[in-house]
C-alpha cells in the first residue's frame, strides 16, 4: 500500500482547508413586511412571492406552475 513520501506541512494543510467554509445565505427584504427572507422563496410571515399572495394561513391560495 502506498504511503506519502513526505508529511503534509501546516501551511499546505491550512491552505487546502480554506475552501471548506460556509457561505452567507442570500437574503432579500420582503416588500410587504420589510423582513429579511431567503431569495426565490415565499415569505413565511406574509405568504407573498414576487408581489403575489400565494399562502394564506398556511393554505395554498394560488398555484404557480
UniProtKB/Swiss-Prot annotation:
The keyword ATP-binding does not apply. Pfam families: Ribosomal_L32p (PF01783). Keywords: Ribonucleoprotein, Ribosomal protein. GO terms for molecular function: structural constituent of ribosome. One of its GO terms (cellular component) is large ribosomal subunit. The keyword Oxidoreductase does not apply. GO terms for biological process: translation. InterPro entries: Ribosomal_bL32, Ribosomal_bL32_bact, Ribosomal_zn-bd. It comes from the Bacteria. Belongs to the bacterial ribosomal protein bL32 family. This is Large ribosomal subunit protein bL32. The lineage of its organism: Bacteria, Bacillati, Mycoplasmatota, Mollicutes, Acholeplasmatales.
